[in-house]
C-alpha cells in the first residue's frame, strides 16, 4: 500500500514576526500650525493614535480639548517661550511636528521685502526655534522631530523664491540635524505634495491650483507622520515624499 504526501504547492507560509519590536506609543506631540490644514490633520491623527497633541499656532484649533498657545512663529523668541509654556501646561514633548507654513507668491522684485522675509521667518526660523527649544526634552525621551518641507524643497519654481528658499532651508536644516543628533533623537523630513487645504486661499487665480489639479487629502499625509512617530527606537524614516498619484510638481 502506498501513501501520498499532501502537496504544498500553492500553500503560503506565515512569516514569524514575533521578534520584531512593537511600534512606539504616540505620546505628547507638539504641532506647529495645528489649527488648520496639515497641522490640524496631524492633531486628529495623534488623537486617533492615542497620543496627546498640543498646538502652537497664531489661532486656536477648532477641535475642543486640545491644549494650544497662540504665538507668532515668525518671532523666534516668542516661539521658544511658547514651547516652555506648553511644557508647563501639558508636560514635555516626545515628538514635534513643524507643520506651520506661509507663502508670498510673485516675482521677486514685486514682493514687499517684509512679506518675503516673513515667509523665511515662519517656515525656516520658526521651525528651528521650536525644534531647538524642544530638543532637550526630545533627547531625554529619545523622541522624534518631523519637519515639513515641500516639493519646492527639491526644486525651485518661478514666482516662489521666498517659499523655495525657506523650504530648501528646512530640508538642509533637517539633514544636518539628523547627522548632529544621530542615535539620540529621531529626525524625519516630510515632503508633501499639494493638499486640499486653505493654504491656497487668498492667492490670485494664477497662483491657485487649476481645476484639474490632483491634490492629496491632508489626512493621508498626516497618517504617514504617525508611521514616523511609531518607529521603534533605533529605526527612523529619514525622509518621506507623500503626494497624490497625479502630483505635477514632482518629479
What do these predicted ranges mean?
Residues 189-190, 209-250:
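C-terminal helical subdomain
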Residues 136, 178-180:
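Alpha-helical segment proximal to the catalytic Tyr-Lys
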Residues 35-36:
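Conserved glycine-rich cofactor-binding loop
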Residues 99-104:
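Conserved NAD(P)H cofactor-binding loop of Rossmann-fold oxidoreductase domains
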Residues 107-108, 115-117:
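Substrate-binding pocket helix/loop in short-chain dehydrogenase/reductase
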Residues 131, 166:
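Active-site helix of classical SDR
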Residues 150:
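Residue(s) in the substrate-gating loop at a strand-loop-helix junction
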